[in-house]
Design a protein with these regions (language model features):
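Structural signature of FAD isoalloxazine-binding scaffolds in flavoprotein oxidoreductases
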Residues: 49-66, 81
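Short, charged beta-turn/beta-strand-edge "cap" motif at the junction between a beta-strand
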Residues: 38, 92-94, 204-206
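Catalytic-pocket segment enriched in acidic/His residues
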Residues: 11-15, 41, 117-206
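RNA pseudouridine synthases
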Residues: 89, 96-111
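N-terminal non-catalytic cap/leader segment that marks the start of a structured domain
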Residues: 1-53, 149, 160
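A generic local secondary-structure boundary/capping motif
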Residues: 21-23, 44-46, 70-79, 84-85, ...
């Protein structure tokens, strides 16, 4: 029997330790990512902000639950982490102008863009960094999707990463060069953006 008092107080009926958290989205068509999209990250890297979004991809199969183990590949000696805000698309859209991009956004979640730096930043794979970004388990995500209506200001959210209890990244979405609706509109110029597609919005400063 469910304790109504627990539900009313917003407490979990099932202890958190008794469940396995899955990624909030498990079936999708595309997993598009955006590089160099925080002004602080550009400064950190010593590069100028891009004139247009820098788009790359991961594979949808890279997504794992927020507490699942990341497999460290034996072919890499430099696996790194990047905290990301994630756009969850709610409906099909194609060839949008930037003012229409907001209409296709269902909500947001969070992810880690795990990266093998020695495959991303080298001449391996012909200089393309797909393999450095898209090895198995390289996208822990979730656990929840927050609808856009529930967020007061998407352009003023804290984005942080802790590693073994130490804070490693501390940024804010106010630093985004290209805003979520602009990213959705930009990607829609090239490919059909479907419901439950995902866009990952770059790395914050370390």
């Amino acid at each position: 029997m469910v304790d109504i008092g627990i539900v009313a107080e917003g407490r979990s009926v099932i202890p958190e330790t008794d469940v396995t958290f899955l990624a909030p989205v498990t079936k999708m068509d595309k997993l598009a990512c955006v590089g160099l999209n925080y002004s602080g990250h550009c400064e950190e890297q010593g590069v100028s902000p891009p004139e247009s979004p820098v788009i790359f991809s991961k594979f949808p199969s890279n997504i794992i639950g927020p507490r699942d183990n990341i497999m460290l590949p034996s072919i890499s000696e430099k696996v790194d982490w990047e905290a990301e805000l994630v756009i969850v698309i709610g409906k099909k859209c194609k060839a949008l102008n930037k003012d229409e991009g907001e209409e296709c956004i269902f909500g947001y979640t969070i992810a880690q863009d795990i990266t093998a730096r020695d495959w991303q930043k080298s001449k391996r794979n012909g200089g393309q960094f797909l393999l450095g970004k898209a090895m198995d388990t390289f996208c822990p995500m979730g656990p929840a999707i927050v609808t856009k209506e529930a967020i007061c200001d998407i352009n003023n959210l804290s984005v942080k990463t802790w590693v073994n209890g130490d804070i490693k990244q501390d940024g804010n979405t106010s630093e985004l060069i290209f805003k979520p609706h602009e990213i959705v509109a930009y990607i829609s110029q090239y490919v059909l953006v479907k419901n439950i597609n995902i866009s990952v919005l770059s790395c914050v400063i370390r």
